[in-house]
C-alpha cells in the first residue's frame, strides 16, 4: 500500500513555569505534492474540528498530553496519527491526492458545529461534475442555487438572488478579482469553466469585515493550482462545447502553471447543418483561464491569475432587399498578481494588484438606419490583508483596499440617411476605499465571538459633466462640469459586523450574527437577469449608496460521528436606497439616466433548513427555504409594499448521489419553487381622447387596467434531472484515464414557463397571459479525460 501522507515532527523549544506545565503552541502546515498549500483542510484534534487558513496553516494551543489528529481535504487521502505534545511543536503534513474520477461526493462546508462563521457553504468541482446539467455544460453558479437561500431568476437564468437581494448585490469573485458580468449566452451559462475551477464558496450572511461593496452575498470562486511535479492534462467534449486544461511545473517543486480553455461550437454545428439558411449568422462564447505560482522560499509565494472571455453574436438578413445586420460582442478581462508572505508562525500577509474590465460593443444596421453603442466598467485595485494569531484565544485580521473606477455609461451614435445623432455621454470616475479590522475571541470554552468593523469611502470625481436636478428631483435642463479629480459626491460609512458561537453538548451549537453592508455601484436594468445591455452606474449626488442590515440566528447539529449535518437558520434583512425605473424608461444613450430612476426600500425574511449525508455509498442533501421579500417605492403601487418579482415563498432542493458499483455512479436532482411574481393587466377598456376636428369623430384608445404590482404568480417551477457517471477502469494505474457522463434534464418533461406575454383580443376587449416555454426533456453526454 502506498503512503497517503508523510509527516515530520519537529520539537522546537519547551517552557516550564514553576511546578506547572505550560500549554504548548502547536503549528500544523498541510501541503500537497510540490509543497502546494492546502487551504481549508479539516483537522480534527481529539474530535475538535479546525480548518487551515488560505496558506494551509493552523496554529492551536494545547495542554501537554497525547492527542489523536486526523487531517483530511477534498481530493486528498486523509491521514490519522497520534502524537505526544510536551513542548511547542511543528507538524508538517503532506497529503497524497486522489486521482480517480469516482469517489464519494463530499460538500466542503464551513457550516459545521464548531466554526464561528455562519451562513456559508461551498462546493467542489468533483461534486458538481457528477450532477445533471442542461446540455451537459457544468455551471457552478447554477449548482449553488441548489443550496437554501439562493435562487435564480427562472428557467436558464444565471442571475442570482440571495436572501431577497438583487442580481447586482452579489460580490462575485474569481481568485479575489471582482466579476461584473458572470454570464454567457444572455444568462443561460456562467463564465466559470469547470475545468479550471477548484471550488466555489457562498457567504449569505454574517459577512466577514474583509468583504464589502455589495449588500447580499459573497460568491468566491477559486481556480485550480497547477501541478509542481509533472505535466498533466484534462478535458471534456460535450454536445455544445469542449474544454481542455494543461498544467505542470515551470520550475519543478517551486513553480507551476495551469492553462484552461473552453469554446462552444453552436455556430459551427449550425453552419454545417443549415449553411444556406445560417450564412454568417451565429453565436459562440469562449473562456481562457491561466494561473501560475512561484514559491520564492518556504515563507514567500507569488501568484498570478488571468481570465478573458467573450460572447460573440452575429445576425444578418439581406433577403428581399432588406439590409439588417446585428453584431454584439461583450466580455470580461481579469488579471491579478498576489504576494503571500508568512512572516512568522503567528503573522502573515497577502498583498495584491488587480485589474478587471467589462466591455460591451454593438453595431447594428436596419435598412437606412444604423446604430452603434458601447458601454463598460474598468477597475484598478490594490489591497493588503494581514492576519495575526496570538494564541488559541485571540486572532486578529486587518487590511486596506483601494479601487479606481472608470464607468463608460453608454456612448454611441444613430445614423438615419444623411442625419447623424451622436451621444456625448461622458465617462464617469470614482475612488472607492475601505479599511477593516476583525478579531476572533474565545470568551469561554463554550462561547466564541467574532467582532469586526469595516469603514468604507466612496467619491465620484471629475472630469465629467452632469445634469442639475431641482429640489423636486426633476431635471432643470442645465448641466454642470467638473475638472479632473474634483469631488462630485462623497460618502463614508461604518459597517459593523459581529457573530457569536455557543457550543452545546452532543456536537451541537447555536450561532447568531449581525451585518451592515454598503453598496456604491448599481446595475441599471429593467430586466431580471444581468443581460449585456445593462449599465453599471456609480453613486452620486442623486443616486445614494444602498445600505442593508441583516440579523441571523441558527442551530447546527452533527450526528453519527459527523456523517450527518443538520442546520436551521432564520434571517431578517432591511435594504434602503433600492433602485427601480419608471415605466417605459430608456436606458441606452440617455444623458438623463438618473432622472429615470426612483428610489425605495426593501425587506426580506425567512428560514432555511439544510440536512446533509456526507459519507457512504449514498450522499446528498435536502435544502428548503421559506421566505418573503418586498419592495416599497413612493411612486409605485400607490406607495404600498409589493412583492419583489423574484420572491419565492417555497424553495426545495433534493440532491442525491449513489455509487452503484466500482464503475457506475448515479446522481439525481429535484427542485421545486413558487412561481415568480409579475404584473399582468386585469382587463382592458376604451378611453375617449376627444374629437377629431377634421371630421368631428371621437378618438378612442385602449388602455390596460392594472390592480397592483406583481399581484400575479407564474405556475410553480419543478423539475427532475438525473445523471450517470461511467468510469471504465476506475482503479487503473495508467497515466491516461477517462469517464463518461450521461444526463437527462427535465426527466418528466415539465413545461416550466420562461416568461409570460399579454395577448390582446381587440374585438372582445380582453387580455390573456400566454406562457412561453424554453427547455423540454434534454439528454446530454460528455466524455471526460485526463492524463
Named regions from a protein language model:
Residues 379-385, 424, 432-434, 538-544, ...:
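Outer membrane beta-barrel strand-and-loop segments of large Gram-negative receptors
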Residues 359, 406-417, 421, 459-477, ...:
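Surface-exposed extracellular loop regions of Gram-negative outer-membrane beta-barrel proteins
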Residues 93, 146-147, 191-230, 234, ...:
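A beta-strand signature from Gram-negative outer-membrane beta-barrel systems
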Residues 108, 113-168, 173-207, 224-225:
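Periplasmic N-terminal accessory/gating domains of Gram-negative outer-membrane beta-barrel systems
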Residues 281, 299-381, 421-428, 531-532:
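Flexible loop and strand-edge segments within Gram-negative outer membrane beta-barrel domains
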Residues 31-36, 42, 72-76, 86-134, ...:
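Short, acidic, small-residue-rich periplasmic hinge/interaction motif at the N-terminus
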Residues 663, 672-700, 715-721, 725-787:
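C-terminal beta-signal and adjacent terminal beta-strands/loops
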Residues 571-574, 593-680:
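Gram-negative outer-membrane beta-barrel transporters
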Amino acid at each position: 500500500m502506498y503512503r497517503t501522507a508523510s509527516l515530520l515532527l519537529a520539537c522546537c523549544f519547551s517552557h516550564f513555569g514553576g511546578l506547572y506545565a505550560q500549554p504548548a503552541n502547536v503549528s500544523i502546515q498541510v501541503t500537497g505534492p510540490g509543497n502546494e498549500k492546502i487551504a481549508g483542510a479539516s483537522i480534527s484534534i481529539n474530535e475538535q474540528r479546525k480548518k487551515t487558513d488560505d496558506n494551509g496553516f493552523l496554529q492551536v494551543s494545547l495542554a501537554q498530553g497525547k492527542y489523536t489528529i486526523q487531517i483530511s481535504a477534498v481530493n486528498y487521502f486523509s491521514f490519522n496519527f497520534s502524537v505526544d505534545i510536551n513542548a511547542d511543536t511543528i507538524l508538517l503534513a503532506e497529503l497524497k491526492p486522489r486521482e480517480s474520477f469516482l469517489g464519494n461526493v463530499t460538500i466542503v462546508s464551513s457550516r459545521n458545529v464548531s466554526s464561528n462563521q455562519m451562513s456559508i457553504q461551498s462546493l467542489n468541482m468533483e461534486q458538481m461534475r457528477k450532477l445533471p446539467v442542461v446540455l451537459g455544460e457544468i455551471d457552478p453558479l447554477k449548482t449553488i442555487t441548489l443550496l437554501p437561500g439562493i435562487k435564480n431568476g427562472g428557467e436558464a437564468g444565471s442571475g442570482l438572488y440571495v436572501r431577497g437581494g438583487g442580481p447586482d448585490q452579489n460580490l462575485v469573485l474569481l481568485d479575489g478579482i471582482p466579476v461584473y458580468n458572470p454570464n454567457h449566452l444572455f444568462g443561460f451559462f456562467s463564465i466559470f469553466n469547470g475545468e479550471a475551477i477548484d471550488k466555489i464558496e457562498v457567504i449569505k450572511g454574517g459577512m466577514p469585515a474583509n468583504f464589502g461593496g455589495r449588500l447580499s452575498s459573497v460568491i468566491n470562486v477559486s481556480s485550480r493550482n497547477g501541478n509542481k511535479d509533472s505535466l498533466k492534462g484534462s478535458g471534456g467534449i460535450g454536445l455544445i462545447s469542449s474544454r481542455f486544461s494543461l498544467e505542470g511545473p515551470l520550475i519543478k517543486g517551486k513553480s507551476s502553471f495551469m492553462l484552461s480553455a473552453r469554446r462552444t461550437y453552436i455556430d459551427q454545428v449550425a453552419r454545417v447543418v443549415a449553411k444556406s439558411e445560417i450564412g454568417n449568422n451565429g453565436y459562440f462564447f469562449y473562456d481562457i483561464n491561466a494561473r501560475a505560482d512561484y514559491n520564492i522560499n518556504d515563507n514567500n509565494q507569488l501568484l498570478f491569475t488571468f481570465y478573458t472571455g467573450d460572447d460573440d453574436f452575429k445576425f444578418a438578413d439581406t433577403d428581399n432587399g432588406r439590409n439588417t445586420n446585428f453584431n454584439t460582442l461583450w466580455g470580461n478581462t481579469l488579471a491579478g498578481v498576489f504576494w503571500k508572505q508568512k512572516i512568522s508562525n503567528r503573522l502573515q500577509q497577502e498583498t495584491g494588484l488587480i485589474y478587471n474590465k467589462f466591455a460591451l460593443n454593438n453595431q447594428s444596421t436596419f435598412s437606412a438606419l444604423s446604430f452603434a453603442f458601447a458601454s463598460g466598467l474598468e477597475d484598478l485595485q490594490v489591497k493588503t490583508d494581514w492576519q495575526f494569531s496570538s494564541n488559541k484565544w485571540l486572532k486578529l485580521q486587518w487590511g486596506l483596499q483601494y479601487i479606481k473606477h472608470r464607468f463608460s455609461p453608454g456612448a454611441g451614435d444613430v445614423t438615419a440617411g444623411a442625419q447623424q445623432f451622436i451621444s456625448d455621454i461622458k465617462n464617469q470616475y470614482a475612488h472607492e476605499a475601505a479599511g477593516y479590522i476583525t478579531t476572533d475571541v474565545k470568551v469561554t470554552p463554550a462561547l466564541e465571538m467574532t467582532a469586526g468593523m469595516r469603514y468604507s469611502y466612496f467619491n465620484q470625481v471629475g472630469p465629467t459633466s452632469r445634469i442639475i436636478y431641482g429640489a423636486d428631483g426633476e431635471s432643470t435642463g442645465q448641466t454642470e462640469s467638473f475638472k479632473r479629480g474634483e469631488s462630485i459626491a462623497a460618502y463614508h460609512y461604518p459597517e459593523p459586523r459581529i457573530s457569536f458561537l455557543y457550543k452545546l453538548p452532543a456536537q451541537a451549537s447555536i450561532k447568531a450574527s449581525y451585518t451592515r453592508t454598503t453598496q456604491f455601484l448599481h446595475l441599471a436594468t429593467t430586466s431580471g437577469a444581468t443581460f449585456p445591455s445593462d449599465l453599471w452606474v456609480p453613486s452620486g449626488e442623486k443616486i445614494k449608496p444602498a445600505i442593508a442590515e441583516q440579523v441571523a440566528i441558527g442551530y447546527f447539529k452533527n450526528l453519527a460521528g459527523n456523517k450527518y449535518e443538520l442546520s436551521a437558520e432564520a434571517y431578517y434583512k432591511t435594504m434602503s436606497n433600492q433602485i427601480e425605473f419608471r415605466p417605459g424608461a430608456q436606458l441606452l444613450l440617455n444623458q438623463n439616466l438618473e432622472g429615470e430612476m426612483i428610489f425605495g426600500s426593501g425587506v426580506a425574511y425567512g428560514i432555511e433548513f439544510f440536512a446533509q449525508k456526507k459519507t457512504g455509498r449514498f450522499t446528498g442533501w435536502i435544502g428548503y427555504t421559506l421566505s418573503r421579500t418586498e419592495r416599497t417605492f413612493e411612486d409605485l403601487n400607490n406607495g404600498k409594499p409589493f412583492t419583489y418579482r423574484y420572491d419565492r415563498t417555497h424553495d426545495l432542493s433534493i440532491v442525491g448521489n449513489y455509487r452503484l458499483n466500482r464503475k457506475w455512479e448515479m446522481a439525481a436532482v429535484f427542485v421545486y419553487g413558487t412561481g415568480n411574481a409579475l404584473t399582468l393587466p386585469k382587463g382592458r377598456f376604451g378611453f375617449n381622447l376627444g374629437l377629431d376636428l377634421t371630421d368631428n369623430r371621437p378618438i378612442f384608445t385602449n388602455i390596460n387596467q392594472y390592480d397592483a404590482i406583481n399581484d400575479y404568480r407564474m405556475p410553480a417551477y419543478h423539475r427532475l434531472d438525473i445523471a450517470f457517471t461511467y468510469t471504465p477502469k476506475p482503479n487503473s494505474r495508467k497515466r491516461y484515464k477517462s469517464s463518461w457522463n450521461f444526463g437527462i434534464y427535465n426527466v418528466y418533461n415539465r413545461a416550466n414557463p420562461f416568461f409570460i406575454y399579454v395577448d390582446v383580443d381587440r374585438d372582445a376587449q380582453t387580455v390573456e397571459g400566454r406562457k412561453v416555454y424554453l427547455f423540454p426533456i434534454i439528454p446530454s453526454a460528455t466524455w471526460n479525460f485526463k492524463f
